[in-house]
């Protein structure tokens, strides 16, 4: 997996083409991350290098100004090659997209957060939804993967 220097998103960025390039690279490592039960740091670095962590930030604050539907396509394409990368990335993305939406539609005071995400390339994390303390599940290793039985209240 190659790691280039970080680039700022440019107006007119072809996010889907960039996602396809990253997906092709992370596909080879997906099984490794799953079998080692390790964080998808390589995929995260590639996403950061291409400016994806600021993609949902409005352009006027230094972000990539990607739309919601296009970001969903990006996450879908990543998920087809490495579900763990797509899931971890979506946990950041939904927080930034929500802050951008609230700024645009509710005039919420999220400008400071959005500017910092863009300027500092911050990665945000979330708890994963509603009452995660009552979530439970079991993952049993099987030949060729895992059998997962779980309950999550959204």
Please describe what each predicted stretch is.
Residues 41, 45-49, 54-154:
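Glycine-rich flavin
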Residues 1-73:
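Alpha-helical interface subdomain recognition
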């Amino acid at each position: 997996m190659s790691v280039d220097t970080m680039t700022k998103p440019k107006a007119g960025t072809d996010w889907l083409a960039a996602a396809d390039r990253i997906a092709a690279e992370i596909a080879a490592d997906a099984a490794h991350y799953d079998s080692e039960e390790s964080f998808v740091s390589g995929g995260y670095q590639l996403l950061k290098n291409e400016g994806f962590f600021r993609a949902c930030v409005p352009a006027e604050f230094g972000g990539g100004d990607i739309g919601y539907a296009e970001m969903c396509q990006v996450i879908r394409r990543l998920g087809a090659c490495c579900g763990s990368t797509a899931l971890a990335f979506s946990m950041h993305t939904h927080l930034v997209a929500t802050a951008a939406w609230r700024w645009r539609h509710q005039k919420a005071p999220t400008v400071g957060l959005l500017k910092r995400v863009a300027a500092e390339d911050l990665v945000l994390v979330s708890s994963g939804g509603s009452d995660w303390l009552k979530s439970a599940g079991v993952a049993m290793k099987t030949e060729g993967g895992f059998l997962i039985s779980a309950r999550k209240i959204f």
